[in-house]
């Protein structure tokens, strides 16, 4: 660094911020994230604490940056990450033993489903060989749909615990998360969990880790997170193996506005500091700083190397101001600081439309979605409208589980009443003039005439799927992949009984409950991970549902032509079961362009207008029947209103081991008066 001192900086995660230098000091070269020197920033007055330091803050103040450790836990779904986090918090005295369960799973949806959705952080203090160490633990999700949370967490860490279930061994998402961590250059500590189970086979799991990841398994720690067996051996391993030193989150408080989670790279930040955002150029006054211990614990200052939270006074009220990966520095030092590169923007793979049940709740729904976007920036949002459902939003997600969890959070945390359309995947249109357009909304897909005249090629997205399962189910899994238009890439037997199979699969097939079918075919023993692969030429069509020859745009889908007939027949059959009879005939059709693939008719109720008529009055009889006929025709064509748009949970048998469930939405035309 040529003897130059650096101005303080912070990086936010969902709204990552970093503090500016209050009292600049020279840091060791290995902690300098900048390739070239910067000039000295103006030295500000030393802080004058307004109240005595707490015991925790006194211990933190005495710890040099060389004894900071940032680490996370890398694992497959349900291999015990959150339980192990609880044991570590208990060992360090952060929480009381035996009184907590999955402390870092803070969302209701996480506790209900038993999975980790949001990466959560906690600061721990641990005395090792007579010296205090500051440990920042980040509990990360394991499911592929939340890979963005995982990658952001890895960016703020120096190392990770590679956790494997002793009874299940290495799984698909273990492999995927390992390569994410490896790409970030993290130091990995092998850990075998659940060694107390009767079905545990630690030697097999260690051999898989050695073969698959080429790790030194002699240093692996065998633990039981549930009972606490050998967990005390992990903390010394973390301190001795993980090197000393971008965290990634923000959330919303009704009273404080946006609260950001940040890692301080240089200098320090405290209440009263004036900060500026590199992303927006907006300036803020720090109202409070603190650490997660494990809940929000105020501190007088955050120093370089620490991970903590910041809120501003007055608060940041607009969630759009919070940019994941943003860099903050002190006002006046902007020219002396180079912002960090931030994070790679995730690409949405699955799209749904969201509409409020009551159109008057549109603005409340918009505000609720924006607040959730603060700490889940992998979701994309744009406004749209539907003739059937009115104003709403087109939301993009990383997968179907991601979508389902987001919906649950809207309902539980914000009390939103919403209607979601079936998930769809994007489609790329290559026009004859060479331009390309990606359509995420099926209702905007070109019609039949436009496709014939102006379109050169249609493409759909493919993914590279990695499937791990016992060898005995190999035939069933390959048959399932072939039935879903898959192309085999490779097959590897990494133990005598376990297979890793890689297939190129259309993303649309994965959205159509491929995972449920896979679990059914392997009795629940298979796991799958996938990554974006490429766009491929495909014969896709827009499948529409028509009610009385009027398209219901909210449920249209882009499907492969080979599936259009089957899906169309399923649609009309199941919709018929959930539409009540009316005073007029209801015709339900599934169509591709002008070609009607399937039709069901719901006969009307018969109102006997001749009941009180004398049998011999033929003229009067004809007149009443003609009047009834004209009335029904008028109701059906003009004088009818859409007064019921309902959500039905319809069982659809997809040929698996059990009935699967598909969410379907539909509009029904009902007369204003009979």
Curated annotation (Swiss-Prot):
<keyword id="KW-0999">Mitochondrion inner membrane</keyword>
<keyword id="KW-0547">Nucleotide-binding</keyword>
<keyword id="KW-0648">Protein biosynthesis</keyword>
<dbReference type="InterPro" id="IPR005225">
    <property type="entry name" value="Small_GTP-bd"/>
</dbReference>
<keyword id="KW-0378">Hydrolase</keyword>
<dbReference type="GO" id="GO:0045727">
    <property type="term" value="P:positive regulation of translation"/>
</dbReference>
<dbReference type="InterPro" id="IPR035647">
    <property type="entry name" value="EFG_III/V"/>
</dbReference>
<protein>
    <recommendedName>
        <fullName>Translation factor GUF1, mitochondrial</fullName>
        <ecNumber>3.6.5.-</ecNumber>
    </recommendedName>
</protein>
<feature type="domain" description="tr-type G">
    <location>
        <begin position="66"/>
        <end position="246"/>
    </location>
</feature>
<keyword id="KW-0809">Transit peptide</keyword>
<dbReference type="InterPro" id="IPR031157">
    <property type="entry name" value="G_TR_CS"/>
</dbReference>
<feature type="binding site">
    <location>
        <begin position="75"/>
        <end position="82"/>
    </location>
    <ligand>
        <name>GTP</name>
    </ligand>
</feature>
<feature type="binding site">
    <location>
        <begin position="139"/>
        <end position="143"/>
    </location>
    <ligand>
        <name>GTP</name>
    </ligand>
</feature>
<dbReference type="GO" id="GO:0097177">
    <property type="term" value="F:mitochondrial ribosome binding"/>
</dbReference>
<dbReference type="Pfam" id="PF06421">
    <property type="entry name" value="LepA_C"/>
</dbReference>
<comment type="function">
    <text>Promotes mitochondrial protein synthesis. May act as a fidelity factor of the translation reaction, by catalyzing a one-codon backward translocation of tRNAs on improperly translocated ribosomes. Binds to mitochondrial ribosomes in a GTP-dependent manner.</text>
</comment>
<dbReference type="InterPro" id="IPR006297">
    <property type="entry name" value="EF-4"/>
</dbReference>
<dbReference type="InterPro" id="IPR000795">
    <property type="entry name" value="T_Tr_GTP-bd_dom"/>
</dbReference>
<dbReference type="GO" id="GO:0006412">
    <property type="term" value="P:translation"/>
</dbReference>
<dbReference type="Pfam" id="PF00679">
    <property type="entry name" value="EFG_C"/>
</dbReference>
<dbReference type="GO" id="GO:0003924">
    <property type="term" value="F:GTPase activity"/>
</dbReference>
<dbReference type="GO" id="GO:0005525">
    <property type="term" value="F:GTP binding"/>
</dbReference>
<dbReference type="InterPro" id="IPR035654">
    <property type="entry name" value="LepA_IV"/>
</dbReference>
<dbReference type="InterPro" id="IPR013842">
    <property type="entry name" value="LepA_CTD"/>
</dbReference>
<dbReference type="GO" id="GO:0005743">
    <property type="term" value="C:mitochondrial inner membrane"/>
</dbReference>
<keyword id="KW-0472">Membrane</keyword>
<dbReference type="InterPro" id="IPR027417">
    <property type="entry name" value="P-loop_NTPase"/>
</dbReference>
<dbReference type="Pfam" id="PF00009">
    <property type="entry name" value="GTP_EFTU"/>
</dbReference>
<feature type="transit peptide" description="Mitochondrion">
    <location>
        <begin position="1"/>
        <end position="48"/>
    </location>
</feature>
<feature type="binding site">
    <location>
        <begin position="193"/>
        <end position="196"/>
    </location>
    <ligand>
        <name>GTP</name>
    </ligand>
</feature>
<dbReference type="InterPro" id="IPR038363">
    <property type="entry name" value="LepA_C_sf"/>
</dbReference>
<dbReference type="InterPro" id="IPR009000">
    <property type="entry name" value="Transl_B-barrel_sf"/>
</dbReference>
<comment type="similarity">
    <text>Belongs to the TRAFAC class translation factor GTPase superfamily. Classic translation factor GTPase family. LepA subfamily.</text>
</comment>
<dbReference type="GO" id="GO:0005759">
    <property type="term" value="C:mitochondrial matrix"/>
</dbReference>
<keyword id="KW-0496">Mitochondrion</keyword>
<dbReference type="InterPro" id="IPR000640">
    <property type="entry name" value="EFG_V-like"/>
</dbReference>
<keyword id="KW-0342">GTP-binding</keyword>
């Amino acid at each position: 660094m040529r003897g130059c001192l650096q101005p303080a900086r912070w990086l936010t995660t969902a709204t990552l911020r970093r503090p500016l230098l209050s009292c600049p000091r020279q840091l060791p070269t290995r902690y300098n994230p900048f390739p070239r020197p910067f000039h000295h920033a103006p030295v500000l007055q030393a802080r004058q604490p307004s109240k005595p330091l707490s015991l925790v803050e006194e211990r933190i103040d005495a710890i040099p940056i060389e004894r900071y450790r940032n680490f996370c836990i890398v694992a497959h779904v349900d291999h015990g990450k959150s339980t192990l986090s609880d044991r570590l918090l208990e060992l360090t005295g952060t929480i009381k033993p035996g009184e907590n369960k999955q402390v870092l799973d803070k969302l209701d949806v996480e506790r209900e489903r038993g999975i980790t959705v949001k990466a959560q952080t906690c600061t721990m203090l641990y005395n090792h060989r007579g010296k205090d160490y500051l440990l920042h633990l980040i509990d990360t999700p394991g499911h592929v749909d939340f890979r963005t949370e995982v990658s952001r967490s890895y960016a703020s860490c120096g190392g990770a615990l590679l956790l494997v279930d002793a009874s299940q061994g290495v799984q698909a998402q273990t492999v995927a998360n390992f390569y994410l961590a490896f790409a970030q250059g993290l130091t990995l500590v092998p850990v075998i969990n659940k060694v107390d189970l009767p079905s545990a086979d630690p030697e097999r799991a260690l051999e898989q880790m050695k073969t698959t990841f080429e790790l030194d398994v002699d240093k692996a720690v065998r633990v039981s997170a549930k009972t606490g067996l050998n967990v005390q051996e992990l903390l010394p391993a973390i301190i001795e193996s993980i090197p000393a030193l971008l965290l990634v989150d923000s959330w919303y408080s009704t009273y404080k506005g946006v609260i950001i989670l940040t890692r301080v790279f240089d200098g320090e930040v405290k209440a009263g500091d004036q900060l500026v955002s590199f992303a927006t150029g907006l300036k803020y006054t720090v109202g409070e700083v603190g650490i997660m211990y494990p809940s929000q614990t105020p501190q007088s200052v955050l120093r370089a190397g620490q991970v903590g939270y910041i809120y501003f006074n007055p608060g940041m009220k607009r969630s759009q101001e919070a940019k994941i990966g943003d860099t903050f520095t002190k006002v006046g030092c902007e020219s002396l600081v180079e912002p960090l590169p931030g994070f790679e923007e995730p690409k949405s793979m699955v799209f749904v439309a969201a509409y409020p049940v009551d159109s008057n709740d549109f603005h409340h729904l918009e505000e609720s979605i924006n607040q959730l976007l603060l700490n889940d920036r992998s979701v994309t949002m744009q406004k749209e409208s539907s003739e059937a459902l009115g104003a709403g939003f087109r939301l993009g997600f990383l997968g179907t589980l991601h979508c389902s969890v987001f919906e649950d959070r809207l309902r539980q945390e914000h009390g939103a009443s919403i209607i979601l359309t079936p998930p769809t995947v994007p489609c790329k249109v290559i026009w004859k003039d060479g331009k390309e357009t990606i359509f995420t909304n099926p209702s905007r897909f070109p019609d039949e005439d436009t496709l014939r005249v102006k379109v050169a090629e249609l493409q759909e997205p493919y993914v590279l799927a990695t499937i791990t399962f016992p060898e005995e189910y190999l035939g069933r899994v390959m048959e399932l992949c072939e039935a879903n238009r898959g192309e085999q890439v490779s097959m590897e037997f990494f133990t005598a009984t376990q297979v890793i199979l890689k297939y190129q699969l259309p993303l649309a097939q994965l959205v159509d409950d491929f995972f449920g079918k896979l679990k059914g075919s392997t009795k629940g023993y298979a796991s799958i991970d996938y990554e974006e692969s490429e766009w491929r030429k495909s014969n896709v069509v827009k499948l529409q549902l028509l009610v009385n020859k009027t398209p219901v745009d909210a449920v249209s889908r882009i499907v492969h032509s080979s599936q259009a007939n089957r899906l169309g027949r399923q649609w009309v059959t199941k919709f018929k079961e959930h539409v009540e009879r009316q005073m007029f005939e209801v015709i339900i059709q599934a169509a591709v362009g002008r070609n009607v693939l399937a039709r069901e008719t719901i006969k009307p109720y018969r109102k006997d207008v001749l009941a009180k008529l004398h049998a011999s009055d033929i003229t009067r009889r004809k007149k009443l029947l003609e009047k009834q006929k004209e009335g029904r025709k008028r109701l059906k064509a003009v004088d009818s209103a859409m007064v019921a748009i309902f959500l039905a949970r319809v069982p659809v048998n997809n040929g698996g081991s059990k009935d699967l469930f598909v969410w379907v939405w539909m509009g029904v035309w009902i007369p204003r008066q009979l």
